[in-house]
Each structure stands twice: as C-alpha cells, then as structure tokens.
C-alpha cells in the first residue's frame, strides 16, 4: 500500500508537462497586439508575432524573465544553422550600469564567444534583415529590474523570399560586467534554449534535448521508488520480520522479493541515467552521478553475494552476514541521499512530489522506530523472565541443599 501511495505522489511530478506545454503565451502587450504566439520549451519564455506576407516582414515580441537584478535576457536569430548559438545575432536586455534603466544592445555570437576568449562586446549587427528593436519591462515605466521580472524584446525581421521558418535562440544570465554580458548557466535546460518555428503555421520544431525533461522525470520516479523506498523497505523486513517466529523462514522470501524488485527497477533507472548523460554532453552533476554509481555498485555486489551465501553451519557465515549488513545499509543510505540530490537536479526541491516522498519515507522511519521499541520491550521482557527463572531455580537448588 505504501508503495502505491508513493507511486501516486511521485506521478504528480511525472504528470507535469514540459514547459513548452505547461507554459502560457499571449498575443497582447501594453503597446501592441500580435496574431500568433507559442510557449518556448525552456525558461518559461514565449514569443508572439505577426507575419506580413506582402513584404515578408515579421513583427515579434519575445517574453523572458530575469534571474538576477544585475542579469540579462537575450533573444536572437541564427540565419545559417538551427540549434546553434555560434553565428547568432542577438539582442540582449540588461540594466544600464550608469543609470539603472533597461537598455537593449545588439551582439554577434561568433566562435570566440563560445571559447570565452574575451568579453562579449556590443557591435552593430551585420544582418540587414533586423530593421528595428526595443525592450520594455512588464509593468511599464514604474517597473524595476529584479529577480523574476518579465521583459519584452520587440523586433522586426525581414525574411528571405519563400522562407517562412526562423531559427532563433534565447537565454539569460546572472551578471553583466559593464556592457558585457557574462556566460549564462550551463544546465541542460539553458543549453537547450533554441528552436525553429514556421511564422505562417506556428509549428515549432524544438531541439532533441527538450524531450529529456520527460526522460528525467521517468528516471527520477523509477529511482525514487526503487532506491529510495523499496530497498529501505526490504531492509526493514529483514531486520524485524525475522524476529517473528510465527512466520518462520517466510521473512527471507519477502525480503528477497522486495530487494530484487527494487534492484531491477533501480537498474532501469540507472540505465536511463546513462542515456541522459550521453544525451547531455558537457553537463555533469558530479555528486548525483557519483552517488548513483556507488549505489548501483553496492546493490550489484549485494545481489552477487547471494550466489556465495554460506550455509548456517559454515564458519564463514558470520563474516558474510557482517559484509551483507554493512554493504546493504550503505546502499540504502546512499540511495536515499541520492534521491534528494535528484530532486535538486530537477529543481523540484519544494515540489509536492518531494513532499510526498518525504511523507512516505517518514512513515517508513516511523514504522522502524515503533518496531525497534517493540523489539526492545520484548527483549527486556524475555530477559526479565529468564532472570526470574534463573533466580527461581537457584532458590530451589538452595532449598534442596539445605534439606539434604
């Protein structure tokens, strides 16, 4: 039952649609209205536009958010290659270091920018198709730049004849040094901020990495159930059910079934993690990855150890039990810690999914405490009974000795 509850609560996370579907877009701003809009797959961004086919001109507005009061938000197009930052011509909005007012400057992202050979300097765009641009904060003149503040970047783009597709990029950063925006964060989401859309149909072709969100959620749900709940539950059954003489050796089969199910599900989750790492070159979550490898290795050793389990009469049995307990508990601790690391990687540190997992884990811990207290009560009661029996036998022996 607890596993079903955990699965349901974690599926609250799994049912969260990607931002491209869950986000909202608008065709109306304070100064202008547009015909079409789409939500972009990352950073809760969106874009609205009106296409004028008679002169192949595109009027658009990009909606983004600041992640720092001293940060920047940018949008641009790549006239040559889709899914590429290098070669893009971008417009970046940030607070003027002198006046603090929002300004919008043009930049060309050549290969030196990616290599970070020097600061990014503003220069006129060598793209005659970008005819006008401006930026404003949501809220008008009284609005201030702050963490989470919305910005609107307006632009007019002249498209080539017979071409209604536009390759565009967008991103945001934490700091601006003078008039030089610094590098944006390098999470998988930030590295996936590009797509191609058709201005006539509104159909967007997003990058392949945008689908990784669903894969990450699947990875998280499977691992939370396996490493984060089933393995601890299996350890609990081994510790407390075997003390119940009424069920005999049944406790062992229950323990083995739970642990084997957890390991098989964990193997699936671990494999998904490998796929995610392969699909995200340059993105590494060091601690999460190291804990995952260590947990899977420990679980594999536990499974293999069953093949070499000595009989109860074997003199090496006690050494095997010590090894089995140590590796097992280490695997459980690392697995639970890594589940919480996974919530941070998914940026779900304050989500209902994490709350649900914490409730299920707390319930399991509560059961452990109750069973542990019960075990000590039973142990103390038996010890007292044994002592009374010994004292009684001693008294009888003394009486027998005195009469003789």
From Swiss-Prot:
Kindly indicate whether the keyword Transport belongs to this entry: yes
For this UniProt entry, the molecular function terms from Gene Ontology, in alphabetical order, are: metal ion binding
SMART domains, per the entry = B561 (SM00665)
Q: How does it sit in the membrane?
A: Multi-pass membrane protein
Q: Which residues cross the membrane?
A: 217-237, 256-276, 290-310, 326-346, 359-379
Question: Mind listing the UniProt keywords for this protein, alphabetically?
Answer: Electron transport, Heme, Iron, Membrane, Metal-binding, Signal, Transmembrane, Transmembrane helix, Transport
Domain DOMON residues, every copy:
43-173
Binding of heme b 2 occurs at 255, 324
What main location does UniProt list? membrane
Q: What is this protein called?
A: Cytochrome b561 and DOMON domain-containing protein At2g04850
The organism named in the record is Arabidopsis thaliana (Mouse-ear cress)
């Amino acid at each position: 039952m607890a596993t079903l509850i955990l699965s349901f609560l974690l599926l609250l996370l799994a049912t969260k649609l990607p931002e491209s579907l869950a986000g909202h877009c608008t065709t109306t701003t304070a100064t202008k209205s547009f015909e079409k809009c789409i939500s972009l797959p990352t950073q809760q961004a969106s874009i609205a536009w009106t296409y004028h086919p008679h002169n192949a001109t595109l009027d658009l507005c990009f909606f983004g958010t600041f992640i720092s009061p001293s940060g920047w938000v940018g949008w641009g197009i790549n006239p040559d290659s889709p899914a590429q930052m290098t070669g893009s011509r971008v417009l970046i909005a940030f607070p003027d270091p002198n006046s603090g007012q929002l300004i919008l400057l043009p930049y060309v992202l050549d290969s030196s920018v990616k290599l970070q050979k020097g600061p990014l300097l503003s220069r006129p765009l060598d793209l005659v198709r970008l005819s006008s641009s401006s930026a404003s904060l949501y809220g008008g003149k009284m609005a201030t730049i702050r963490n989470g503040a919305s910005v609107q970047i307006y632009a007019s783009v002249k498209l080539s004849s017979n071409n209604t597709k536009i390759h565009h990029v967008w991103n945001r950063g934490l700091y601006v040094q003078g008039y030089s925006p610094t590098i944006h964060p390098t999470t998988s989401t930030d590295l996936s901020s590009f797509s191609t859309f058709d201005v006539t149909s509104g159909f967007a072709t997003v990058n392949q990495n945008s689908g990784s969100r669903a894969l990450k959620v699947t990875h998280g749900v499977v691992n939370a159930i396996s490493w984060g709940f089933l393995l601890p539950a299996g350890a609990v059954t081994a510790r407390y059910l075997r003390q119940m003489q009424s069920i005999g050796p049944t406790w062992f089969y229950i323990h083995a079934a739970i642990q084997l199910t957890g390991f098989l599900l964990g193997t699936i989750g671990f494999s998904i993690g490998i796929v995610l790492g392969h699909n995200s070159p340059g993105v590494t979550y060091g601690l999460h990855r190291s804990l995952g490898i260590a947990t899977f290795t420990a679980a594999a050793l536990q499974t293999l150890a069953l093949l070499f389990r000595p009989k109860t009469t074997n003199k090496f049995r006690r050494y095997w039990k010590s090894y089995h307990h140590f590796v097992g508990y280490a695997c459980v601790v690392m697995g639970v810690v890594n589940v919480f690391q996974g919530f941070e990687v998914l940026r779900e540190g304050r989500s209902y999914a994490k709350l649900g997992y914490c409730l299920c884990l707390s319930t399991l811990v509560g059961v452990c405490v109750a069973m542990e207290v019960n075990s000590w009560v039973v142990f103390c009661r038996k010890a007292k009974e044994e002592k009374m029996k010994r004292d009684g036998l001693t008294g009888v022996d003394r009486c027998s000795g005195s009469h003789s």
